[in-house]
Regions:
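Short, flexible loop/turn elements at secondary-structure junctions
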Residues: 2-4, 28, 89
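PAPS-dependent sulfotransferase catalytic domain
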Residues: 1-24, 69-72, 76-77
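PAPS-dependent sulfotransferases, especially Golgi type II membrane carbohydrate sulfotransferases
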Residues: 15, 32-161
Length: 161
């Protein structure tokens, strides 16, 4: 579940009362740098100059407020219907993390799933990794960590899972 999910809609558990929601946790410093880069590249197709510091300031404000609302909405989700999944479960160690996530949501992990996993996580040949730098957008690690302090406290617990 992205923190912005349900901010302008009903919570998914009110529509699907038996649902189990997965909240994937990732370091906001990494997310902000990546997100700002995405916005920059999207804006670069226009003929107007791109204000990199403006992108950083605007999206730090918007995303940190969205996270605050997401954390408040989270309180309405029954704990047994919410799985906190560190990004590392799927990002850096999917062979361990994918079965762990399946177990957490009560889904079986089969030999067929395990056999399909390498192809699902393989990077196609010739593709470039997305690279980004927080400072390019006029932001510092300290600013982002401060803006997401409440979320980082929650994420610290999820990362120990």
């Amino acid at each position: 579940m992205a923190p912005r999910a349900g901010l302008h809609r009903r919570l998914p558990v009110t529509v699907f009362p038996d649902a189990t929601l997965v909240w994937c946790h990732r370091d906001p410093v990494t997310v902000m740098a990546s997100f700002c880069s995405l916005i920059e590249h999207g804006m670069a197709v226009s003929s107007r100059p791109v204000d990199l510091a403006g992108i950083g300031a605007t999206w730090l404000d918007l995303l940190s407020r969205a996270m605050t609302r997401g954390l408040a909405a989270r309180a309405a989700i029954p704990p047994e219907q919410l799985v906190d999944a560190p990004y590392s479960w799927l990002g850096s160690d999917p062979a361990t993390g994918a079965p762990k996530l399946h177990a957490a949501v009560g889904a079986p992990w089969t030999e067929a799933d395990a056999a399909r996993l390498p192809a699902a996580v393989a990077r196609p040949k010739g593709t470039r990794r997305h690279t980004y730098d927080l400072s390019r957008y006029g932001l510092t690690r300290a600013e982002v960590e401060s803006a997401f302090a409440d979320y980082n406290a929650l994420r610290a617990g999820a990362d120990r899972a």
